[in-house]
Design a protein with these regions (language model features):
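Pre-Walker A-like glycine/lysine-rich segment at the N-terminus of P-loop NTPase domains
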Residues: 1-46
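Generic alpha-helix structural propensity
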Residues: 24, 35, 39, 56, ...
């Protein structure tokens, strides 16, 4: 479990400046449209997940007339407290943890899992299985370090095998190699997805 002890914002969407100390339990954000409730959640997600809550681009977070934004959060997980600061400008992001620049974000993401659920995620229930697999993969990234590499290698093998099948002169031996790679990494991916699915229940 992750606890956010404090959050400081400077230039994030509608917030020019804010200091917030959430309570230790459930926090309710109440207010009219456009007052900044979602922006607060987006700031927390950016601090923990290192990317925006809605989409992937950082530019929309910067208020009109500004060139950059900044947030700082003091969080605690696994009995370890750390300060995470994120500075962002047009197309750029700089992350520091305990005042040291973070060069490998994956190291931090493994320690603080955050999986959001927003109204636009209703397609998880109403849509096809692809969206649900994506959610399982997002969850798995935090708990199983090998999952991202398994997915990368699976997609690589799939692309190579499909290209081989489309070619007029396909090598049966090479086709067998890629098929075995698909089976190998596909089995690992399915096992991890099943494990994460059981945890959701």
């Amino acid at each position: 479990m992750i606890r956010v002890h404090s959050l400081d914002l400077k230039g994030l969407r509608c917030w020019q400046k804010l200091h917030w100390e959430p309570g230790p339990d459930i926090n309710l954000l109440i207010g009219g449209n456009g007052v900044g409730k979602t922006s607060l959640l987006e700031a927390i997600h950016l601090a923990l997940g290192l990317r925006p809550l809605l989409g992937f681009r950082l530019d929309p977070l910067i208020p009109e007339g500004s060139e950059h934004g900044f947030l700082s959060a003091v969080v605690e997980s696994h009995n370890e407290r750390r300060e995470i600061s994120v500075g962002f400008a047009k197309g750029k992001r700089r992350v520091r943890v305990n005042d040291k620049r973070l060069r490998q974000p994956d190291q931090l993401l493994q320690q603080q899992a955050v999986v959001p659920f927003v109204p636009s995620d209703l397609h998880l229930v109403q849509g096809g299985p692809q969206a649900r697999r994506k959610l399982l993969d997002q969850t798995a990234f935090y708990k199983h370090r090998e999952h991202a590499e398994n997915l990368r290698r699976y997609n690589q093998a799939l692309a190579a095998r499909n290209a081989l099948l489309r070619s007029r002169k396909s090598d049966p031996n090479l086709l067998d190699v890629w098929s075995r790679e698909l089976a190998r990494y596909g089995a690992s991916i399915q096992q991890i997805r099943s494990h994460c699915s059981e945890e959701f229940h």
